[in-house]
Amino acid sequence: VAGPFRIPPLRREFQ
């Protein structure tokens, strides 16, 4: 659970 929208590859945004 990296965020509320872990479906799209936006992991760089919460990094």
UniProtKB/Swiss-Prot annotation:
Record's keyword annotation contains Flavoprotein: no
Residues that span the membrane, as ranges: none
Keyword entries, A-Z: Antibiotic, Antimicrobial, Fungicide
Domain of life per record: Eukaryota
GO annotation terms (biological process): defense response to bacterium; defense response to fungus; killing of cells of another organism; xenobiotic metabolic process
UniProt subunit comment: Heterodimer of a large and a small subunit.
Additional observations: Antimicrobial activity is not affected by salt concentration.
Role of this protein: Possesses antifungal activity against P.infestans but not F.graminearum.
Identification of the protein by name: Antifungal protein 1 large subunit
